[in-house]
Amino acid sequence: MAESKGSTSKEGFGDWCILEAECSDVENDLEKLFDEDTDSDISDLLDDNDLEQGNSRELFHQQECQESEEHLQKLKRKYLSPKAVAQLSPRFESISLSPQQKSKRRLFAEQDSGLELTLTNEAEDVSSEVEVPALDSQPVAGEQSGDIDIHFTALLRANNNRAILMAKFKEAFGVGFYDLTRQFKSYKTCCNAWVISVYAVHDDLLESSKQLLQQHCDYVWIRQTAAMSLFLLCFKVGKNRGTVHKLMMSMLNVHEKQILSEPPKLRNTAAALFWYKGCMGSGGFTYGPYPDWIAQQTILGHQNAEASSFDLSEMIQWAFDNNHMDESDIAYQYAKLAPENSNAVAWLAHNNQARFVRECAAMVRFYKKGQMKEMSMSEWIYARIHEVDGEGHWSTIAKFLRYQQVNFIMFLAALKDLLHAVPKRNCILIYGPPNTGKSAFTMSLIRVLKGRVISFVNSKSQFWLQPLSECKIALLDDVTDPCWIYMDTYLRNGLDGHVVSLDCKHKAPIQTKFPALLLTSNINVHNEVNYRYLHSRIQGFEFPNPFPMKADNTPQFELTDQSWKSFFTRLWQQLELSDHEEEGENGESQRTFQCSTRSANEHL
């Protein structure tokens, strides 16, 4: 018999177990099932009685109170500082003899369900700290040194420490900080006077600063009220805000956040009175004399009565005596005169300063031009060389002319004709190669005699010759072919020494003669046939040699004002200049020009 394929079942599992469910006809009866569905084996499972309202409102109220209490405790934990009690009594906190663990009142109240917890809480409440919001306490003078750390910590916690310092300053001194100062935006702007307010300074350091600041300042003003210390410092040299802060931080051992600094108001009478009266109290300290801006506004003197009125004639007289004819020069120099001149103070206080400066400059030019026209050439040279300080030697000029192979006698003769305005002899030409010293020689002469320089570059303007009507001697430097053509065409009469019509700006053409004229050029006009009509009107001297220089690149021949002063003094007779007019016709000393309303013998 063949074996069956596949696996063989183990013993005991070879037969199938067939079970058959027993069915009954009762389960198929639907009506009976529905009838039995409402019945329950558990009695009174559902309460079918009427419901009552109860006390739900009280329950809701309790839940709301509990939720609010939890929210309040969270806010307390978030915003209240655990060290706030130290600000209430810092001295009491500092006298603790031994460290001990301080218990704090619980933020979240616990349910007291027993006697032991109640007794424990009562024992802890005896030494508990009450947490309150941090307060900015204002210490008295005696408690300041012990409260420095508290003040500084409160200042660092503030979002706007500058606003806090401003408020504390006004509370301490009764005025705002900016009522006494003007604002400097930049930290690099320098000023001699500074107003400095420092918050929470130790008493010992403040006392030492009174002595240390004296070596840096001409005037020291210090006053302390509560935690604020106010300084007015007038330094010997100008300092910027950064330098001032470094000085105060090192001297007072403070942080930069504790310092306010601005320059004082110099023209505010109320601010000046604050500083003047502040030093009279018992708590103030001062060193040095009052600054000028405080003394002028608080101390009554004879200058105050004079400073109220401005005299333009006095300003014109000052500018005339000091040879100030430029508007910017007059304005700057007269403003510098204000500390010692009451009229300058009144001018600074006037609203029409610019108009007065323009009028002053115009009047000085008129006076100077009239004075120049009245003086002869000898008087003009004598007045100019006596304005030169120092002494030189005329031989420097003679040696330079000899170096350039110029006959000194012929040059003196040409210079004499030039100064005396001899017709057809009032123009000298210096010609030669470049770098021979032509311009240096002529410029030095023009400088000492206060002459004018005209430039052909302005020849397109019909007023380019106007400076010739305002001087005794003039220079036309570096004459080129276009300039020679212009002179040959239009300036023959002027070079002859005759009266010409000269067009001037803002006025009608005037009748005048050309002054003594110096020319420099690289062209020898006497060798040019095209300019033959200029040969008899111009005297020429050649400079053929390069200008000599020393090893240190300085000129070997120093053509200075002192050299020309010595030249004219030594050769005064050879140039046939008139005698020195130091005295009048009757032997009396000549009176200086007066253009102010002040009398000659009036007290200054």
Curated annotation (Swiss-Prot):
Sequence ranges of Polar residues compositional bias: 587-604
Ranges for domain SF3 helicase: 406-556
Residues covered by region (Disordered): 579-604
Residues noted as binding ATP in the record, renumbered to the chain: 432-439
Region (DNA-binding region): 144-307
Residues with the Phosphoserine modification: 81, 89
Positions of crosslink type Glycyl lysine isopeptide (Lys-Gly) (interchain with G-Cter in SUMO): 513
Catalytic function, reaction form: Couples ATP hydrolysis with the unwinding of duplex DNA by translocating in the 3'-5' direction; ATP + H2O = ADP + phosphate + H(+)
PROSITE patterns: SF3_HELICASE_1
GO molecular function: ATP binding; ATP hydrolysis activity; DNA binding; DNA helicase activity
PTM remark: Phosphorylated.
Keywords: ATP-binding, DNA replication, DNA-binding, Early protein, Helicase, Host nucleus, Hydrolase, Isomerase, Isopeptide bond, Nucleotide-binding, Phosphoprotein, Ubl conjugation
EC class of the enzyme, as a word: isomerase
Domain of life: Viruses
Major subcellular location class: host cell
EC numbers on record: 5.6.2.4
Gene Ontology biological process terms from the UniProt entry: DNA replication
Short sequence motif Nuclear localization signal: positions: 76-78
Location in the cell: Host nucleus
GO cellular component: host cell nucleus
Function: ATP-dependent DNA 3'-5' helicase required for initiation of viral DNA replication. It forms a complex with the viral E2 protein. The E1-E2 complex binds to the replication origin which contains binding sites for both proteins. During the initial step, a dimer of E1 interacts with a dimer of protein E2 leading to a complex that binds the viral origin of replication with high specificity. Then, a second dimer of E1 displaces the E2 dimer in an ATP-dependent manner to form the E1 tetramer.
Family that this chain belongs to: Belongs to the papillomaviridae E1 protein family.
Subunit structure: Can form hexamers. Interacts with E2 protein; this interaction increases E1 DNA binding specificity. Interacts with host DNA polymerase subunit POLA2. Interacts with host single stranded DNA-binding protein RPA1. Interacts with host TOP1; this interaction stimulates the enzymatic activity of TOP1.
Name of the protein in its database record: Replication protein E1
Organism: Human papillomavirus 19
